[in-house]
Amino acid sequence: MVSPSRHALLQLGAYHRATKLIFFIVALAAFAFYWLSSFALVARNGTQHFHADTWLYAELSEPNLFDRILPNTQLARIFRFHPVTVVLAAGWMKIVNPLTAWFTPAQLLKALFAAVGALGVWASLWAFAALLPRRYALLWGVIYASSLGIWYFSSIEESKIVTATLSALYSATYLRMRENWTRSGAVLLTAILFIACLNEIVAVFLVAIPAVDALVQARWEALKRWWIAAHAMAAPLALALLEGVIRGWGAVAGSHPEGANHFSMFLWYASHTQFTFNSVYYFLTTWLFFNIAAPERHAYHWANPSIHFGGIFMPGLTNYVASPLSAALVALFAALLAVIVALRKKIAILPNVAAIMIPLLAYAFTRAAFFFVFNPKENMLFSPSATLAHLLLLAIPFAATSLPERAKVTLLALLAALLFVNNGFFIIG
């Protein structure tokens, strides 16, 4: 006869195995949808929206990649600022080369970005599961996967989904080691940060999550947590590698201030930023809302094919109520916010769950503030890396409300389904 404690352990083990299987299936489904979506976007000529450099990253599928990285070329530029994406693509194309008998190199490259996006979905599921019951984590993971920024950039060739996925992996890793710190966990977290900073140096803002979390939980005792300071050194190390080694390679040295180095790039873009009400409004609507849900079925406004620009959404939130589908989505989102405000109660799902909201908010705010100063016009490119933080800031208080469990699950399921359909219409055009 199995003892009660042994039976409980067996049940717990079965639960964890089932969770791993479910999360893997969701990630696999995301990969399939993203890869199929990439073909739909090509068919409707929709791969160059939101200032994406798809036309440039598509060259990563062609042979002799590093031989084509010549001085003052666009390939040299993306290698200088996003070397992880370039090296990842080069390695991937070598690995899948035997599959060119059935797929074109372009299709195989699209599969890479779809797989990277799916890995981010898998990471998001574990991030939600670290703070919420599995039924909520699963639904919020589907919402993350269906969000427009994640879906779109997983379906085209762009470095931004690599950064978003590394951000999700970082968040999931930290949330899971938060209550059980280990040296190996800290090393893994630092490795993710280093790779993320190599792909986009602004990923350094991820350090705000453990740093602010330590301050919130331990206040001045946090200064004794030496590992966070050592962990943060991954960012300047990555910058030194980018500026001192990669930029020092003659083939990638640039001269224009827009791309000569990271500092001149920041100053060049920031000097062109206009701080007006319209710019703030457009930035916030895109960063917070368009990144999650498409406000209209097409994004052809201000399109200019001569410069590989497929257009953006018309600035403004009123387009959400122009169709019954998006209007219903808005109504569900409003209901979710109303539940959070009206039925809120003390967050006690897991110990210290409420405390993580401040670090997540700190990361989301610093990333948004930087890109508002740096490049507000192209903010749709950079918002997917904040998607998980934004959704966690909604998921945690919503799970803690006094709304009945069945009603919570129903509302989230409807929201996930409508978001998938709404953004799916945009993908297929």
Predicted regions and their residues:
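Short acidic/glycine- and proline-prone juxtamembrane loop motifs at membrane-interface regions
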Residues: 155-160
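Membrane-interface alpha helices of multi-pass inner-membrane proteins
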Residues: 184-201, 206-211, 233-234, 415
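Transmembrane-helix signature of polytopic, membrane-embedded enzymes
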Residues: 124-146, 164
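Short hydrophobic/aromatic helix or loop-helix immediately within or flanking a transmembrane segment
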Residues: 71-102
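Perimembrane helix-loop-helix junctions
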Residues: 2-5, 11, 176, 205-237
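Specific aromatic-rich, kink-prone transmembrane helix
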Residues: 123, 150, 162-180, 185-193, ...
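Membrane-lumen/periplasm interface segments of specific transmembrane helices
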Residues: 33, 37, 226-327
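Transmembrane-helix motifs of polytopic, lipid-linked glycan transferases
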Residues: 111-131, 169
